[in-house]
């Protein structure tokens, strides 16, 4: 009678889970959260988060086939990232029929290798109390705004993402970016720059 009846949310690396883990997870009320960040090896290497994409794909298919709720999170604003490479990461997630895709802006934590090397990539941060990377040598601020719009359209369509990338991008162009999703005081600082956003 004292069995746990709640729901578990477990953060996992997709390439690290085993068939045994998937078997037992399928017997629980569980949601798996996979921090993918990016499908691109150069971007992953820059933040010490390279993925074995073959294994990632195999395991996500197994999780889906087992009927386990799951989501994938990615990051925009990564070193060496571009608008095009970010879109390719999103396209991969859509092709895998991930039910919930979440895209978060990169925050540089003080003392990390990425923060120490930020000038190597020309990373520029916003000027608020919880700064995020908004520009680099490989993406402009306008590119970042368009990545933010894609992030917003993913938020707006959770559990019902369009199957086609083109439809998601169209929704992104129509989205109003809610910057305060990530930090409560960002809206007043960052929202005026949305006037600079361009269509993809």
Map each language-model feature to its residues.
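Short, solvent-exposed turn/loop segments enriched in Gly/Ser/Thr/Pro and often Arg
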Residues: 77, 104-111
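Non-cysteine beta-strand/loop elements that form the S-adenosyl-L-methionine
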Residues: 25-39, 99-107, 117, 123-126
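Conserved SAM/AdoMet-binding glycine-rich loop
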Residues: 1-71, 76-78
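Catalytic cores of alpha/beta
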Residues: 19-25, 79-97, 143, 147
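Short secondary-structure boundary/capping segments
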Residues: 1, 48-51, 88-89, 115-122
């Amino acid at each position: 009678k004292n069995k746990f009846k709640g729901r578990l949310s477990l953060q996992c690396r997709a390439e690290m889970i085993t068939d045994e883990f998937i078997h037992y997870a399928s017997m629980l009320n569980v949601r798996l959260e996979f921090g993918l960040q990016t499908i691109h090896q150069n971007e992953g290497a820059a933040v010490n988060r390279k993925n074995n994409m073959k294994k990632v794909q195999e395991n996500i298919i197994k999780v889906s086939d087992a009927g386990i709720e799951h989501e994938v999170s990615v990051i925009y604003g990564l070193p060496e990232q571009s608008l095009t490479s970010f879109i390719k990461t999103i396209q991969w997630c859509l092709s895998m029929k991930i039910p919930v895709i979440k895209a978060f802006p990169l925050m540089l934590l003080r003392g990390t290798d990425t923060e120490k090397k930020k000038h190597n990539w020309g990373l520029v941060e916003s000027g608020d109390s919880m700064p995020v990377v908004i520009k680099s040598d490989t993406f402009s601020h306008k590119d970042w705004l368009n990545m933010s719009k894609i992030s917003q359209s993913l938020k707006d369509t959770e559990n019902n993402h369009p199957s086609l990338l083109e439809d998601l991008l169209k929704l992104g162009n129509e989205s109003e970016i809610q910057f305060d999703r990530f930090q409560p005081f960002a809206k007043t600082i960052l929202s005026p720059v949305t006037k600079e956003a361009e269509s993809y």
